[in-house]
């Protein structure tokens, strides 16, 4: 089968590899659609970050090259011995986190936690993948396979919002309106936030954020983003979400919050960032980070059935696996109009 495999920074190759075997407790899936995640782009441009290179990942026992892709949906084509809840023909989505004790407790914080499609175990940028039964969720009939490929990134956004102190009626700011930032806006709407400010330079992404109901703050049209948010809100937002991975933006996000406000860092960072402790201390603000998600896929699927996280609003391009590098990663690097690109194996 075909698979996109990470070999090194800026070296992802479409290769022919063996189809995965269906071992006991596992389910073999024919991949329908897989989204390109910001983490995939980080690995391509600046990796390895999560991909094991020098020593095997403790749970997959794999090192690079590894098959990439973790935002995917597909159809069950084979079930292993002992699988009870899935049958051939089922439409499914995959929660791609594996941990030492499976999906128990705070499994996203497990020291050995890994992502299928980054730490090994196969990936969605391939024709087939075989995964543990516990990683699967059935895709409701009313949701398309394209919509299914948005469940994983939507889980990141919903988990970020639900992990914050935000209450219905609160004001929020989202710094960065790439795919996750836009999904955070959707999650904030679902949580009952009133005014949602979107801080974004790209006119195309501003338009997407505005279509989702956000109030735009354009850094190119103001001398001071923080002052503008403070003026519009009467002192700052209750919660800010940093979704850029840009050092100067992190400080802006912290400063944009009100007294006792909170900043949630959603980004994965390639390098460090400098902040001034007094930005936190003097107004008794808090800053927290989130990694991935846990126990949230059912909530995402329920919200999708209500119309949130719509693929029609967020998917800007569909490509085939052979075009992943040029039309996928290349487009995301060069074209700021791109939001979510979906890939099908053939």
From Swiss-Prot:
The keyword Oxidoreductase applies. Its cofactor is Zn(2+). It is an enzyme of class 1 (oxidoreductase). Gene3D superfamilies: Medium-chain alcohol dehydrogenases, catalytic domain, NAD(P)-binding Rossmann-like Domain. Disruption phenotype: Cells lacking this gene have no acetoin reductase/2,3-butanediol dehydrogenase activity. GO terms for cellular component: cytoplasm; extracellular region. Binds 1 Zn(2+) per subunit. InterPro entries: ADH-like_C, ADH-like_N, ADH_Zn_CS, GroES-like_sf, NAD(P)-bd_dom_sf, PKS_ER. Its EC number is 1.1.1.4. It catalyses: (R,R)-butane-2,3-diol + NAD(+) = (R)-acetoin + NADH + H(+). Keywords: Cytoplasm, Metal-binding, NAD, Oxidoreductase, Secreted, Zinc. Coiled coil: none annotated. It is found in: Cytoplasm; Secreted. Its main location: cytoplasm. One of its GO terms (molecular function) is (R,R)-butanediol dehydrogenase activity. Zn(2+) binds at residues 37, 70, 152. Belongs to the zinc-containing alcohol dehydrogenase family. Homotetramer. Interacts with BrxC. PANTHER family: GALACTITOL 1-PHOSPHATE 5-DEHYDROGENASE, SORBITOL DEHYDROGENASE. This is (R,R)-butanediol dehydrogenase.
